[in-house]
Amino acid sequence: MTEETPGFDEKPDVPSGATPEDAEPKAAPSEGAAPAGDAAAAAQTAAQTAGLTAQLDQVRTALGERTADLQRLQAEYQNYRRRVERDRIAVKEIAIANLLTELLPTLDDIGRAREHGELVGGFKSVAESLETVAAKMGLQQFGKEGEPFDPTIHEALMHSYAPDVTETTCVAILQPGYRIGERTIRPARVAVAEPQPGAQTVKADEAEAADDKESGGPEEG
């Protein structure tokens, strides 16, 4: 009996349940798979970076808005403080002005008594003390004879003409004026004199004649 030699046409032993495809060697992974994974990771990182950048921009915007709000509140507070201080000073000045206004008749009496030589003894000391206190509170007296009339600080009670004045002039102080700082609490009550009508023309003619007399005349030979 002749022994049979296995030929090439015989199929190798294949485990049961396996297919011919399983018997074939598997192909190695392609080289493009790794770059694809790196690209996905890079894209994810870029997305995260973009998200963080957007959040940072939002935080910066919110910080800028809060900073602007704080600066605005600080400016409003400073304006409020200045306004309160200004109002406080104004109220104080009004209160002082009202008090000193009530004292003006007494100061007028003191002035008249001084003019008539009646400011003597204890009354003189009291009067001078009152005037000193009023001056410390900012009261200033104004109004002098011979100064030009100013309707903003003078009140003309008497009016006349005078040949020796060149403009409306205070010729008598009937009642002195008083002010506190730049605020006038009572104008000076005065008598005023205006230039005599025609007086300036006469004076000009006289001056011209005097000049002619000094410069003219026949020359001596």
UniProtKB/Swiss-Prot annotation:
Localization per Swiss-Prot or TrEMBL: Cytoplasm
Molecular function (Gene Ontology), one example: protein homodimerization activity
Region (Disordered): 1-44, 192-221
Residue stretches of biased makeup (Basic and acidic residues): 203-221
Gene Ontology CC entries for this record: cytoplasm
Keyword Chaperone: yes
GO BP terms in the entry: protein folding
Domain of life: Bacteria
UniProt entry keywords in alphabetical sequence: Chaperone, Cytoplasm, Stress response
Low complexity biased stretches: 26-44
Signal peptide from the UniProt entry: none
Pfam family, one: GrpE
InterPro entries associated with the record: GrpE, GrpE_coiled_coil, GrpE_head
Membership in a protein family: Belongs to the GrpE family.
Record's subunit section: Homodimer.
The protein, known as: Protein GrpE 1
Organism: Streptomyces avermitilis (strain ATCC 31267 / DSM 46492 / JCM 5070 / NBRC 14893 / NCIMB 12804 / NRRL 8165 / MA-4680)
